[in-house]
Amino acid sequence: MPPSIPVPSIVTRAIPSLARAASTTTKSTPSKEHHVHSYSPEVLPLGYAVASTHASIKKKTGALDLGILVSTTDKPASAAACLTRNVFKAAPVTVTTQLLQSGGGRARGFIVNSGCANAVTGKKGLEDAWEMSNTVTSQLPPGQRGIGTLVMSTGVIGQPLPISSIISKIPELVRSLDDSPKSWLDLSKSFMTTDTFPKLRAKSFRLGERLVRIAGIDKGAGMIAPSMGPPQPPHATLLGVIATDAAISPPALQSALNYAVDRSFNNITVDGDMSTNDSIICLANGAAGKLETQGRETAESMEEITEDGHPEEYKVFREELRSFAEELAQLVVRDGEGATKFVTIRVKNAPSYETAQAVAKSIANSSLFKTAMYGEDANWGRILCAVGYTPTAQAIIPNHVSVSFIPSANVSDPTPLRLLTNGEPEANIDEDRASVILAEEDLEVEVDLGDGHEEAKVWTCDFSHEYVTINGSYRS
């Protein structure tokens, strides 16, 4: 037998705990009430009617969770959409894509529900989305039934819709359609999930010789990092709708929306999570053609603007749409879950727009950067780290890069605070001045790549304790 081997005694020791700085204060989330706007009837687009109701999708009794918008014009509206690129596209995204393709880029309106995303819900989810669309269309006056109703949903992923409750409410919705400012505001509330305020904007502008109007609604506070494109094949979660009474052809509307979304909604992020349901729908019904003397009745006499046939008017419309979409997109960031800061990341002097956009998104999605903004900590090394790992087609040259904090309008000294110049850190950064700048609700970080003339802006928010609290109990 082999000799026995003595078993060594095992000595156990307590592992010392690692000291970690703890927050001594929890900042309250700023009030968002000043972002809620109401509008007079004259500013809202002509030829649309809206309605909303409670369909028992949300748990809170009476909470608006189902809404519709319909173009009341004889001719269906031109319709365009930018939709999520997530491979797990929700059923309403699939249905909307098919309706836009079969309708030749025209639609009568849309139906939206909040509280349930109808995403990853299989064959039944698709059937439910189609039933929502078809039921709205069947309830409209006979002259408005020739083309489909688009569908949007937002809420919890993987749960079935209470479809019977939804369908039973649609006749009531259609009967209550009107164009009052209150109904528009209520419609914006029917989009909300974790949002803290309804997001409605409207304005008018000149398009050629005519005054046209545009209104927009969006929602979103978490699961925000959109990457949306046109329906595939060519023709939020973040949800949004933009309705205008301008006359724009479907191809021109899709082209303008692609341009606008890539410079607005695709340039926001709250938490870096792309939703299965992200959708921006744009409708243009041409009802601004001519105002009659009685009330708000219209005669549709505007020729539809095309990209090649009306290049100057198209460019004006595209820029107005971009600016309007940017304002709507920024509302989502300002309502970011638990957010206390609104942060603009501006990357300039890049070799291409795509490079500038990619660098700005890397910074905006960095959890370390976002927590530093919450802590009002001028830790600019986290900015450089995010710049450095950005995958770009053109290589970033470290000794060309400069970084600055840009003071908000409320700070007495408007001079940018330079942190890094041509890859070299500033020798004596004024930490007191940095604290003053970072104490503001609105912040801006400027990154100069020193290697071109292109620029992009991305908007984000900070990460707070409240973000974890909200998302840790989302379904409860």
From Swiss-Prot:
InterPro entries: Arg_biosynth_ArgJ, ArgJ-like_dom_sf, ArgJ_beta_C
GO molecular function, one term: glutamate N-acetyltransferase activity
Enzyme class: transferase
Family: Belongs to the ArgJ family.
GO biological process: L-arginine biosynthetic process; ornithine biosynthetic process
Functional summary from the UniProt entry: Catalyzes two activities which are involved in the cyclic version of arginine biosynthesis: the synthesis of acetylglutamate from glutamate and acetyl-CoA, and of ornithine by transacetylation between acetylornithine and glutamate.
Subunit (UniProt): Heterodimer of an alpha and a beta chain.
PTM (free text): The alpha and beta chains are autoproteolytically processed from a single precursor protein within the mitochondrion.
Catalytic activity: N(2)-acetyl-L-ornithine + L-glutamate = N-acetyl-L-glutamate + L-ornithine; L-glutamate + acetyl-CoA = N-acetyl-L-glutamate + CoA + H(+)
Catalytic machinery residues: T237
Name of this chain's protein: Arginine biosynthesis bifunctional protein ArgJ, mitochondrial
Cellular compartments per GO CC: mitochondrial matrix
Source species: Cryptococcus neoformans var. neoformans serotype D (strain JEC21 / ATCC MYA-565) (Filobasidiella neoformans)
Gene3D superfamilies: arginine biosynthesis bifunctional protein suprefamily, ArgJ beta chain, C-terminal domain, L-amino peptidase D-ALA esterase/amidase
